Regions:
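Structural preference for beta-rich elements and adjacent junctions enriched in aromatics
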Residues: 19-317
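Extended acidic/polar, glycine-enriched regions
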Residues: 282-284, 291-321, 437-446, 450, ...
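Aromatic-lined carbohydrate-binding surfaces of glycoside hydrolases
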Residues: 437, 474, 505-507, 516-523, ...
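Low-complexity, Pro/Ser/Thr- and charge-rich linker/hinge segments at domain boundaries
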Residues: 226-235, 311-338, 534-566
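Catalytic domains of carbohydrate-active enzymes that cleave complex glycans
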Residues: 332-384, 632, 639-647, 651, ...
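Contiguous beta-strand segments within globular domains
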Residues: 236-245, 417-440
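Catalytic-core region of carbohydrate-active enzymes that cleave or remodel glycosidic bonds
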Residues: 726-800
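Surface-exposed binding patches on compact interaction domains or structured appendages
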Residues: 268, 390-416, 439-503, 510-511
């Protein structure tokens, strides 16, 4: 084949096209035979294969640091797939699975999904690790897997210095078909689980997980003359430049015209060029186009011949809004000048920024400095705009959404920000925030006064906002910690920064009606004060005490090293925020065993009883943290083999002794539960869970057990029902309808939970408050997250951990007199109040009160509330900010209140 090189360097005006992001696509060539399978991609067939040049990170479609290239073709008998996996830390890859259908996905692994039909199921799931260990399953319905399905297919792997490779040969019979013809279409996905850096990559664009058959890409079976497009570059730069480069191979004896189309979403701009490729030749291309769009954009590249797509790729990228901000600031300067303001110095800044912005097209690396200059200019313009409003004051007080994590450089938006208007049920907490932006050249020492007419001062807590590191690696600060103001209610705001007054207003003991007042900010050194008015409407509805959801935050409370000054204050804080399930570590009740499994001396329950007696008045005592695993360790130390007669005897006697002791403390079976194995998602871990569960049933059939399930496999959940009394699936499992049905059909109690480190980065609305709405949506009895308090680092500190975000799990901070609350922790409690308000409406609907129109409207409101979790997830995926998410829930709460009042008449 001779090389015919075509360079297309294009800076063009884009055409407009309304577009919807399509599925990814790839047309693969037909070859006569498979390669010699040795795990090395050096056979000549691979050089002619279709190429997937990169994977996208799940779930944000980012770029992995460890690249993966995938090669695909087919033969009369099989589909052949090759993986070339780059890895910078080969000494840290995981290859624990040795046997077929072990937990291969927990290793560094490659996952292949095949859906030959047009329906979401059945689809086939194949996995291999770097040892060539295989896992396979058929999903006969979405969420319903059968891991006993073991078809014939082959994988070979090879390990190198800087990565590893794999060759797959998948006969058609392995995926339920007898053969294929040119033009046939399958829906597939190719994925990689990389462990040293913890990167999950996918060819298809997914929402949350690999198992999304509706989002699998299109695999088209071509013929021997199918052109091959190999992309070497596909990037979107922060200056709006989109670069594509690669080569097109034409194995046909006829020339072809390849259409190279790039569409930019969401605005639908198109860049379109034709690349001619001579017979049996290769043409190189390089395309450069600049979009005028800004914000989060997606470039979709498609190469097609005769209207048939050969390949389709996407590349998300972000363009900071330099041009639009500059235009807006210029217009604001013009308005200031017309109003008589002295703006000459600002004009000079604006000209300097405009000059720097001219170089953006050639130097995308200059963007950061231009953005910083824009930030400085905007603050200066804002200062000039607000000077008349604040009558020469050095600060501006403005109403803010209390759930938005404040940053020191935040600026007030335009519009009237002088008033806060909110409503609440009787007995509910109300949250409000007033931000204070400094225009001074020195730190401001301010005093806060907050009051509402006819409301006792004790009903209002004044907090300030303390900035903490967002995580161990970030230099970014967020206003998460909310310490109580000092006795003088002082607020210190550094120069040119923004601080916050955070109010927690209790409506307990208040009558229904309007409560009006203000938050006043005044310099301690004298001068004019500023006010933000507050109007609180207390509704003629009592927030019900029932239902009382089960709330658990797992981490210890009374045994945290950084909370030793007054641990009972932290327990009170947890209880005040609804926590009523408490973990008692089984290490506090250790039995001494002999080789026959006999308990050789009385168990010392001293440490256990200290916790149990403290927690028992407030809710369930939970033998958490895998009592089975803890016992297994003790048994091994005594030389007892797993599940031997001595093992069984020791466990049963220990559990019976423990339960008898709990009863001696005045506790009944309704007061305690046992977790057998924490998150037993692996094959061996799950079998262990089942074994220990059966021993628990033998020890005491009345003792209740709980399963924290971060897996959604249908068959496993059906098995687990035998030994599970309380289901606690991870909240992502709730998206699996088949799994939820298994748990619901068991008739047993069901909660949900989440667990994520780096918790300061988690959104107060879409992570913390969200849980209660999700629990209501699925009619759950409780929910939880890890953790209210974590025994790791002091939450005021965030230490870097080998480049990974591993800050802290805690939701409160240690203070001089007990816990300092956080925005996240209060959002969690707000969700608890939402949950009870939603249940009140549900109860009123069931009673059938009110007019037919009111009842019909209430049912529609309830349906809207049940859809709120899905709406929040979509908003989060779309990058819609916290304030809009909070406004969605607050708007729904207002509708719920209105309908509840109507049905109460």
């Amino acid at each position: 084949m001779r090389a015919f090189i075509v360079f297309l360097i294009i800076l063009s005006t884009a055409a407009s096209l309304a577009a919807v992001q399509p599925l990814l696509g790839l047309t693969i060539p037909r070859m006569d035979s498979s390669p010699t399978l040795d795990g090395k991609l050096d056979d000549p067939q691979w050089a002619k294969a279709a190429v997937i040049p990169y994977l996208l990170l799940l779930p944000d479609n980012g770029t992995p640091t460890q690249p993966t290239e995938i090669l695909v073709f087919y033969t009369p008998k099989a589909v052949c797939v090759g993986y070339d996996c780059h890895e910078s830390q080969m000494d840290k890859i995981i290859s624990a699975a040795k046997n077929r259908d072990d937990d291969v996905w927990s290793d560094d692994s490659l996952e292949l999904f095949f859906r030959p039909g047009t329906d979401p199921a059945p689809y086939y799931h194949l996995i291999a690790n770097s040892l060539g260990t295989r896992y396979d399953a058929i999903y006969k319905a979405v969420g319903v897997d059968d891991a006993s399905y073991n078809p014939d297919w082959t994988v070979r792997t090879s390990i190198g210095k800087d990565g590893w490779q794999a060759e797959f040969e998948i006969p058609y019979s392995a995926v339920g078909v007898t053969g294929v013809n040119p033009g046939d279409v399958w829906f597939v996905n190719f994925c990689r689980g990389e462990r040293p850096v913890s990167e999950n990559g996918s060819w298809s664009t997914l929402v949350r997980r690999f198992h999304e058959p509706e989002n699998f890409g299109r695999l088209v079976f071509g013929d021997a003359d199918t052109p091959i497009v190999k992309i070497s570059t596909f990037t979107g730069l922060p200056n709006g430049m989109v670069e594509r480069a690669g080569e097109i191979s034409n194995p046909d004896s006829q020339p072809i015209q390849v259409r190279l189309n790039t569409t930019i979403l969401p605005d639908g701009k198109q860049f379109d060029r034709i690349a001619p490729v001579a017979p049996n030749s290769m043409a190189k291309f390089r395309l450069q186009d600049q979009t005028t769009g800004e914000g989060q954009l997606t470039a979709i590249f498609e190469a097609s011949v005769g209207g048939n797509a050969v390949c389709r790729l996407i590349r998300p990228f972000n363009v900071p809004p330099v041009r639009s901000r500059l235009a807006s600031l210029t217009a604001r300067l013009d308005a200031l000048e017309k109003g008589g303001a002295a703006v000459q110095a600002l004009r000079e800044k604006q000209k300097a920024v405009s000059k720097a912005a001219l170089w953006i097209a050639e130097s995308p690396d200059k963007i950061d400095s231009v953005v910083r200059a824009l930030d400085d200019l905007e603050r200066a313009v804002l200062t000039a705009e607000f000077r008349p409003k604040v009558k020469g004051a050095e600060f501006y007080a403005w109403a803010a959404n209390p759930w938005v994590q404040l940053k020191p450089a935040d600026l007030p938006p335009t519009g009237d920000l002088s008033a806060i208007s909110t409503q609440a049920y009787r007995g509910e907490n109300v949250y409000a925030a007033v931000n204070v932006t400094s225009f001074a050249e020195q730190a401001l020492d301010l005093r806060v006064t907050a009051g509402l007419a006819s409301m006792p001062e004790s009903n209002i807590q004044v907090h300030t906002c303390a900035f903490v590191k967002e995580d161990g690696d970030s230099k970014s600060l967020i206003g998460d910690a909310l310490p109580l103001a000092d006795q003088a209610n002082r607020l210190i705001v550094p120069q040119y920064q923004t601080g916050q007054v955070f109010l927690i207003i209790s409506t307990k003991g208040l009558q229904a009606g309007d409560y009006k007042g203000a938050v006043s900010i005044c310099p301690t050194t004298g001068g004019d004060s500023q006010e933000v008015t507050v109007n609180l409407q207390v509704l003629p509805l009592d927030l019900p005490d029932d239902p009382k959801p089960r709330l658990c935050t797992w981490g210890g409370i009374l045994n945290i090293s950084w909370a030793k000054t007054d641990p009972m204050a932290y327990l009170k804080d947890a209880v005040d925020h609804g926590v009523n399930v408490f973990a008692v570590n089984p290490q506090s009740a250790v039995p001494a065993l002999d080789a026959e499994g006999n308990i050789t001396k009385p168990i010392d329950y001293t440490a256990h009883d200290k916790l149990a007696k403290a927690y028992a008045p407030y809710g369930l005592i939970s033998g958490m943290y895998s009592i089975g695993i803890v016992y297994d360790g003790w048994a091994k130390k005594a030389g007892i083999a797993y599940m031997s007669p001595a093992y069984r005897k020791g466990f049963i006697n220990w559990v019976r002794d423990w339960i008898a002791h709990l009863k001696s403390l005045g506790l009944g079976y309704q007061d305690f539960i046992f977790e057998l194995a924490d998150e037993p998602n692996g094959k061996d871990e799950f079998q262990f869970f089942m074994d220990i569960g059966r021993l628990m049933r033998e020890a005491d059939p009345k003792a209740r057990t709980v399963l924290t399930a971060n897996f959604g496999e249908y068959d496993r959940l059906k098995q687990a029902a035998e030994v599970t009394d309380i289901w606690v699936p991870h909240n992502r499992v709730l998206a699996n309808e088949a799994s939820v049905k298994v748990m619901k059909d068991s008739g047993k109690e069901m909660w949900t939970y989440v667990c994520a480190g780096d918790s300061k980065r988690l959104d107060p609305i879409s992570y913390y408050r969200f849980l209660a709405w999700q629990a209501f949506r699925y009619d759950l009895a409780g929910w939880g997250f890890f953790a209210h308090m974590w025994w790791g680092e002091n939450p005021w500190e965030s230490k870097s951990n080998a480049g990974k975000h591993d800050a802290t799990f805690s939701s409160v901070y240690p203070g001089a007199n007990g816990p300092v609350t956080s925005r996240r922790w209060e959002a969690y409690w707000k969700g608890h109040q939402d949950f009870r308000a939603l249940h009140l409406l549900k109860t009123l609907i069931a009673k059938g009160g009110g007019s037919p129109d009111a009842l019909s409207k209430a049912k529609a409101v309830l349906a809207e509330a049940e859809n709120a979790p899905a709406k929040l997830e979509e908003m989060q995926r779309s990058g819609i900010p916290t304030q809009a998410q909070a406004e969605l829930l607050d708007g729904l709460r207002a509708k719920v209140a209105e309908s509840s009042i109507e049905l109460s008449k």
